[in-house]
């Protein structure tokens, strides 16, 4: 049997290798460290956590990422097994002893008889006619490999993300907000609009200028801004009126709630096909998360908004997966090539693990000539996979954490306070059914 090639032994690559080897499929796992280090890594361990040691909430009843933890445990995830073995006290979060965690992953991979861990930088991935290659090189993919990937995907690759906050549709106050496209173009209701008067606008701009910012990490410091994705607070620094002539311009829109003309308008654009998530247009930011929640809650209509994703700008290499990848993570133009982890546009340790797990399972089925089945969209894993391979807005695609806004709504009414738990119960039931059908 041909060996499968995996490039990158981070969380996604390590998990993909484990899933394949556990199904008796030999794997060549390439990791360039320690011979070539990244600006962020400190060791040569597989699955090294380069930022926080937290895998976020472990509450599977009220947290989408906690639900994803539980689903991954049921799928024999190596990463989750090592995390549970080396967890440290962190309240309701799953935090780990960073060194022991990555050392355990490395040991498991090195000792598996079907995994060959090769310490070598790959610039041109090997493409075998009877095998598959999984690229899981992570958010710091650079150099020759980045150039090779860019040659395969064209211009649909980014090296810096510009993430605007995303709001749950159900949490927007439509006694103040309204749906309308500028000059009533398109369907006429393509945007949600939140109007400000002059006093509200000037208070908002001042809050942006005074809000605490997140410092760049050392390896991000020299990454330039692009005029098309300036942080909103940087635009505010260029002049008090800049925003109302930019992303907050009020022209072409009529507020049905007030007769007087709006001084500035915040627009939100639909971010997924389900219509459950709405993106704050032009609001990419380096404000701290507490500052974002405080300042953006002053926008009329967003006072009680649920932010399923907050804004950020940082170094991040990722492809436009909704355009490029099939639902099985295969490059549409080269089906023998798969992508997994943060390079696909999933955001976060657990999401990268989940993507790697699915890539490994998919290739295993392909190698055996078996039909491939993706978990239903009602599960955390299925919702995340469908988001990056087609449900997301490809025109404005940016990395995404797992969240309940990716899940289909219920056909029957569920009270808001019970909704998260209901999502979780439905997900675990459907995942169990899927596992029984796809064991």
Curated annotation (Swiss-Prot):
Is Nucleotide-binding found in the keyword set?
no
| Record's protein name | Methylenetetrahydrofolate--tRNA-(uracil-5-)-methyltransferase TrmFO
> Which family would the database say this protein is a member of?
Belongs to the MnmG family. TrmFO subfamily.
Q: What is its EC number?
A: 2.1.1.74
Q: Where does FAD bind?
A: 8-13
Q: Please describe what this protein does.
A: Catalyzes the folate-dependent formation of 5-methyl-uridine at position 54 (M-5-U54) in all tRNAs.
Organism, scientific name: Magnetococcus marinus (strain ATCC BAA-1437 / JCM 17883 / MC-1)
Query: Which UniProt keywords are listed?
Result: Cytoplasm, FAD, Flavoprotein, Methyltransferase, NAD, NADP, Transferase, tRNA processing
Gene label? trmFO
Identify one Pfam family in the record: GIDA
Which InterPro entries has this protein been placed in? Answer: FAD/NAD-bd_sf, MnmG-rel, MnmG_N, TrmFO
Q: Which GO terms describe its molecular function?
A: flavin adenine dinucleotide binding; tRNA (uracil(54)-C5)-methyltransferase activity, 5,10-methylenetetrahydrofolate-dependent
